[in-house]
Amino acid sequence: MSYAKIIGRNKEINILDRIYKSKKSELVAIYGRRRVGKSYLVSECFGKKILFKAVGTYIKDGDKDYESYRQLQLAHFYDSLVIAGLSTKESKPTCWREAFLLLRKVLEGKRNRRKIIFIDELPWLAGPQSSEMIAELGYFWNSWADSERNIILIVCGSATSWMLDNVIHDYGGLHGRLTETIKLFPFTLSECEKYYKKNAFHLSRYEMCVSYMAIGGIPYYLDKLRNDRTMTDNIDSIFFADELIHQEFKDVYTGLYSSKEKYVDIVKAIG
């Protein structure tokens, strides 16, 4: 595995390296705020070694028509199965039990030493009525994947409370099954400095501190900075000209809550 492009994350890299080298199946949950680099970390660590990747899709007002929501997520899951090698002659799954049976079929046809499954944006994939999907995920793990001894299943999500309630502290099929839990934090100021140096920014310590106070250590925001601008111009662009942060305010709450209005009202009142 190659870690050359990753800034910091030494503890997390050591965990992922260990699970790849282990001689048993591993079930890993990764959570942390949006834009903090969860998907990037997994993709950079494992790359093409990931045999199957599914990504949950945000659907506005999904709680108002759950069956349509579920079928769309299942359709996307099926597309990922086909990309992973499932024959298009196989019928599309109509429920999560069928979906995970098809995933098992795909993996049984692979001869890889370690079979890595990456399920990203799990809260969106499971949906407003998440119990069915989580129950079937637990059954998939307990009835087959765990005993195979060569499966690595990584689930990832930005909705922290959801991940804690439904995966990490689950009292159903996933209870006590996680072999590793990773909470990914923003970059420290020191890691931001490494980022700037690696990307040819010529900043004083003062400018680095100004940047950190303005946008924190969020890799997504750091990636929007340009090394041919002063830090003042970069911050002006992000907050005003490009309206990146203004749009982020809308996107973050939309992505985390099905009914965001009351949370937005609270933040606006505090501000």
Q: What are the residue ranges of the model-derived segments?
A:
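Phosphate-binding site recognition
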Residues: 1-271
